[in-house]
Amino acid sequence: MRHPEHQYLDLLAQVLEKGDQRIDRTGVGTRALFGAMIRFDLSDGRVPILTTKRVYWKTAVKEMLWFLTGQTNIQALLKENVRIWSDWPLARYRKETGDSISQEDFEKRVVEDNAFATRWGDLGPVYGKQWRRWLGADGREYDQIAELVQTLKSNPASRRMLFHAWNPPELGAMALPPCHMVYQYHVTSSGKLNCILYQRSCDLLLGAAFNYAAASALQLMLAQQADLTPGEFIWFGGDVHLYLNHLDQAREQISRAPRPFPTMRLTRRPDSIDGYRISDFEVDGYEPHAAIKADVAV
């Protein structure tokens, strides 16, 4: 049986060979395809943490747990040594103040100075805000995650089990509009929880691996809370691209042979979706190839 990671490697190769090349918002330039799908089966306990390069899965899961808190300030992430969101507020700070502060010093100030963090560490109404506190036209805040969990428990045959973060009136205030936009869930008659993730924009070299790991972790949490078992994770990409400064790294990754996916399990069951901690996740059998370094386009 062909290793499921080959779906990802094949997509890398397709973008390299057939992608439409153009200059993008960041100025770096991309090679892109429009429309892609990958399916992973989580029912045997194995999760798609890519093996053809080391993926720092704890960072991805910590980010997902942060989203679930509804927070939008990077201070909490930095206290967990998660630095993947620092580029955007740092760029804003440098632009607005003219200060050429280093990223290390900027992050240190965000962690240690609450007033500075409040002024410069907030990302605007990004994922967590929309997932947990979507502001309706009636002035009420809607908790999409709580509604999803309740529906999974009370009406698992529903076709309305989804949440998303694309809130047009608030897009302009976000540091970055949502890339992984829509999560939809489906429960089979045998009690398996399936997930579709639609991602409008996918940085295929850097972003996709995190999205696969984080979405799988969320699927495990939701399944546990609703007394279900994980089923399929199905990923759809809209604009699937490689930045032009990532092409050599993509070729290196394609040259590597996949190794067995690791297993992920939850070591305890919290009372609610809000109770999970990074220590609740145990990954076994992860023996990837070496990490591949690449710069983030801001």
From Swiss-Prot:
A GO CC term assigned to this protein in UniProt: cytosol
Quaternary state and interactors: Homodimer.
Organism listed in the record: Rhodopseudomonas palustris (strain BisA53)
UniProt-listed Gene3D superfamilies: Thymidylate synthase/dCMP hydroxymethylase domain
Pfam annotation, one family: Thymidylat_synt
EC numbers for this chain: 2.1.1.45
Family the UniProt entry places it in: Belongs to the thymidylate synthase family. Bacterial-type ThyA subfamily.
SUPFAM superfamilies tied to this protein: Thymidylate synthase/dCMP hydroxymethylase (SSF55831)
A Gene Ontology biological process term: dTTP biosynthetic process
Name by which UniProt lists this protein: Thymidylate synthase
UniProt: (6R)-5,10-methylene-5,6,7,8-tetrahydrofolate binding residues: D203, A297
Signal peptide (UniProt feature, chain positions): none
Pathways per UniProt: Pyrimidine metabolism; dTTP biosynthesis
Residue positions of the active site: C179
Family matches, as CDD domains: TS_Pyrimidine_HMase
